[in-house]
C-alpha cells in the first residue's frame, strides 16, 4: 500500500540536510516523477525565479514502484525550472540509479541554494554527506566518476554527474548516469552546475521484494514469450531505436538538411543495421529489463564502449540533420556529448542550424572561428562540441545558447531557420508525416518532445493486431492514414495518449515496455504490477488522472510565468511541404494547426483563447490550491 513519501532536502548554501515526510494520501495523488517534483515546486518555489539562480530547486524523484525487477520501469526523474525553455523542466533517465535512491529510503531529493565551492552529495541510508568535489570539477563525466570511486574508497554506488557543459551553464547540458545515459533535454545539467553540484552518488542497495510474489511472477515468468511475439520489441533489441532511421527513410520522413527535406542521400550508411554490422559490440539494459535496447559500440580512435553508443535521435541529429553520412563521426559526436554532458538532440540540431545559416550567408567564417560549416560532413563536430561545452568565446559561446537564442542574437533571418518549440530543438520526427505530433510538440509544457504522446502510426494498426495491447483505451479513435490532414481525431489522440505518457513518466515507466501501442505490457498489467509490488489497489482511471494532474500542474506553473496559447506555436519549417518516397506531397497548413489546437484545448478543459486550464478542470483534478 502507499506509504508516506520521504523527501531529503539538501540546502547547499547552508551545507545542511533534513528529511520531511509527505502524507500518503497526498503522495497517492502525486506518486513520484515530476508529479511529485511539480507539487513541491508549486508549493515551495516562486515560478518566476531565474533558472540559474540559487532559488531554483533541483529535484531528483523516483516512483513508489522503483526497485522491483520487471522490464521497463525504475526510471528517475529530475525536475527544475529549465534554463533552455524558461518553463517547468522535466527529464527521465533509465539505468540503475532510481532503485538505489528508493533503496536508501528516499522518494525525492530536493537541492536548494548554491554551494560556495564544488561539491557532491553521497547517500548511504540515513547518512547524507556533502563532500568536496574540487578534484572532479572540470573533468569529463567518466573521469569524474572514477575520482568519486577513489574519494569514497569503493565503487559500490550509482551516480548522476555533470560534465564541463553543466559547469559552464550550456543551456542544453545533461545530467549523465553510467557515462552513457542521460537526464537529457531542458538543460537541467546547467541548473546542477549553477549550484556547484558536480554529482549525486548513492550507495547500492538490495533489490526490493514484492508484496505478492506469486502475483508478481505472473508478469515476469513469460517475458521471453511476450518479447518473441512482438516484432517491435524484437527489432528494438536487435538494432535499438536506430532502426527508425531505415523506417523513416523508407517513407521519406527522415529529417534532413535542417528539416528542408525528408530524405538524405546515403542514409543507408547511418542506418541501425549498419551500426549493428560495423560497430556494435554489446547490448546493455536497464534495471530488471529484458529488452536490452542500449547500444555499445567500439570505433577505433573515435568511440569507446564505456560511453555506450548512439540511438536514433543522435544518429539523426548528427546524421541526416547535418547531411552527414559518416557513422563513425556520429559515434564520435555521441561520445563527446556524453563525456562533456550535453543533449545530443539540441547539440546536433543547433549545429545543423549553424550549417544552414552558413550556407545561406547569415553566418560567415568570422562568426565560426574560421570553420566552413556546410551540410555533408562531420569534420568539425569535435571542435564544435568542445567549444560549446567550454563556452569558448566565439562560435562556442553562441551555440551554447541553443539555436533559438543564437538566432535571436544573429538576426538577419536566422530565426526562420530554427526548428524548435519554446526554444527546445525538435527531435527527429516530422510533423508533416506524423501530424498529431504537431499538436504535442506545440502544447508540451517543456518544449518539443517525442516521448510525451503516442505517434500517428498507432492509428493505422487494426484493433485486432496481436501487438495492440491497449485496445480499450484507443478503440475510441477512428482509424486514419498517418499522412492525412491534422484534424479533430488527431488532436484527441494527442491529448488522450499524452495522459498515458504523463502517467508513465510519473511512475518511472519506459515507453518501450509500457507504451500505449505495440509494447510489452498493457493497462491491466500495470494495475496488477501496482498491486503485486506495493499492494496498491488502483485502477487505470486513477492512473490516467494522475497523468493528467501532472500535465495541468506543469501548465499552471508555466501560466504563472506568462506562458499562454501564443507560446504553443510551430516554427516556420513545420509548414513546409515535403514529398515522400511515394510521391505524395505532405503538408500541414496553419489553419489546420490552429483548428487542431482548439480541439486539443477543448478535450483538455483548457481555455481556448489563453491555453490555461479552466477552473472546472483544476477542481476536477484536486488542484484548486494552485
Regions found by a protein language model. Name each.
Residues 1-189, 194-213, 217-238, 242-264, ...:
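Protein-protein interaction/assembly regions in multi-subunit complexes
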Residues 149, 156-160, 164-186, 190-626:
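Extended C-terminal regions of large enzymes
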Amino acid at each position: 500500500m502507499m506509504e508516506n513519501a520521504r523527501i531529503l532536502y539538501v540546502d547547499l548554501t547552508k551545507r545542511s540536510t533534513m528529511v520531511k515526510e509527505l502524507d500518503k494520501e497526498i503522495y497517492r495523488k502525486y506518486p513520484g516523477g515530476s508529479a511529485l517534483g511539480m507539487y513541491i515546486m508549486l508549493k515551495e518555489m516562486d515560478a518566476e525565479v531565474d533558472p540559474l539562480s540559487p532559488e531554483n530547486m533541483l529535484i531528483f524523484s523516483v516512483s513508489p514502484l522503483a526497485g522491483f525487477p520487471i522490464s521497463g520501469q525504475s526510471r528517475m526523474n529530475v525536475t527544475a525550472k529549465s534554463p533552455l525553455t524558461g518553463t517547468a523542466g522535466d527529464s527521465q533517465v533509465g539505468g540503475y540509479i532510481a532503485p538505489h535512491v528508493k533503496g536508501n529510503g528516499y522518494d525525492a531529493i530536493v537541492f536548494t541554494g548554491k554551494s560556495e565551492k564544488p561539491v557532491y552529495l553521497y547517500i548511504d541510508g540515513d547518512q547524507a554527506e556533502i563532500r568536496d568535489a574540487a578534484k572532479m570539477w572540470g573533468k569529463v563525466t567518466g573521469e569524474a566518476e572514477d575520482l568519486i570511486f577513489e574519494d569514497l574508497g569503493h565503487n559500490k554506488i550509482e551516480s548522476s554527474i555533470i560534465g564541463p557543459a553543466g559547469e559552464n551553464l550550456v543551456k542544453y547540458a545533461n545530467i549523465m548516469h553510467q557515462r552513457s545515459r542521460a537526464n537529457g533535454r531542458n538543460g537541467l545539467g546547467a541548473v546542477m552546475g549553477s549550484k556547484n553540484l558536480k554529482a549525486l552518488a548513492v550507495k547500492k542497495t538490495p533489490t526490493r521484494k514484492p508484496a505478492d510474489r506469486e502475483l508478481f511472477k505472473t508478469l515476469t515468468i513469460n517475458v521471453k514469450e511476450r518479447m518473441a511475439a512482438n516484432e517491435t520489441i524484437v527489432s528494438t533489441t536487435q538494432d535499438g531505436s536506430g532502426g527508425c532511421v531505415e523506417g523513416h527513410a523508407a517513407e521519406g520522413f527522415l529529417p534532413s538538411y535542417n528539416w528542408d527535406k525528408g530524405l538524405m542521400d546515403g542514409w543507408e550508411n547511418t542506418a541501425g543495421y549498419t551500426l549493428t554490422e560495423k560497430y556494435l559490440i554489446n547490448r546493455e539494459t536497464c534495471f530488471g529489463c529484458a529488452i536490452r535496447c542500449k547500444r555499445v559500440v567500439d570505433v577505433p580512435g573515435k568511440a569507446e564502449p564505456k560511453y555506450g553508443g548512439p540511438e536514433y535521435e543522435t544518429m539523426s541529429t548528427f546524421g541526416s540533420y547535418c547531411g552527414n553520412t559518416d557513422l563513425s563521426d556520429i559515434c564520435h559526436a555521441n561520445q563527446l556529448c556524453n563525456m562533456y554532458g550535453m543533449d545530443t538532440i539540441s547539440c546536433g540540431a543547433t549545429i545543423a542550424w549553424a550549417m544552414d545559416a552558413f550556407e545561406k550567408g547569415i553566418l560567415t567564417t568570422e562568426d565560426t572561428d574560421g570553420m566552413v560549416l556546410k551540410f555533408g560532413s562531420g569534420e568539425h563536430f569535435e571542435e564544435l562540441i568542445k567549444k560549446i561545452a567550454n563556452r569558448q568565446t566565439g562560435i562556442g559561446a553562441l551555440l551554447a545558447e541553443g539555436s533559438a537564442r543564437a538566432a535571436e542574437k544573429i538576426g538577419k533571418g536566422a530565426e526562420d531557420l530554427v526548428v524548435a518549440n519554446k526554444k527546445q530543438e525538435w527531435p527527429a520526427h516530422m510533423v508533416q508525416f506524423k501530424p498529431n505530433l504537431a499538436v504535442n510538440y506545440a502544447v508540451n509544457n517543456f518544449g518539443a518532445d517525442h516521448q510525451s504522446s503516442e505517434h500517428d502510426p498507432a492509428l493505422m494498426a487494426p484493433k485486432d493486431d496481436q501487438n495492440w495491447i491497449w485496445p480499450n483505451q484507443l478503440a475510441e479513435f477512428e482509424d486514419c492514414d498517418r499522412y492525412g490532414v491534422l484534424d479533430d481525431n488527431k488532436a484527441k489522440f494527442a491529448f488522450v495518449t499524452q495522459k498515458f505518457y504523463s502517467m508513465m513518466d510519473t511512475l518511472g515507466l519506459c515507453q518501450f515496455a509500457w507504451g500505449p501501442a505495440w509494447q510489452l505490457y498493457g493497462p491491466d498489467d500495470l494495475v496488477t504490477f501496482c498491486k503485486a509490488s506495493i499492494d496498491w489497489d488502483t485502477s487505470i482511471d486513477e492512473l490516467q488522472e494522475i497523468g493528467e494532474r501532472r500535465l495541468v500542474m506543469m501548465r499552471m506553473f508555466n501560466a504563472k510565468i506568462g506562458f499562454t496559447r501564443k507560446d504553443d506555436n510551430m516554427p516556420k519549417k513545420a509548414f513546409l511541404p515535403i514529398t515522400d518516397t511515394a510521391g505524395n506531397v505532405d503538408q500541414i497548413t496553419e489553419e489546420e494547426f490552429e483548428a487542431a489546437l482548439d480541439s486539443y484545448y477543448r478535450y483538455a478543459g483548457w481555455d481556448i483563447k489563453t491555453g490555461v486550464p479552466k477552473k472546472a478542470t483544476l477542481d476536477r483534478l484536486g488542484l484548486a490550491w494552485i
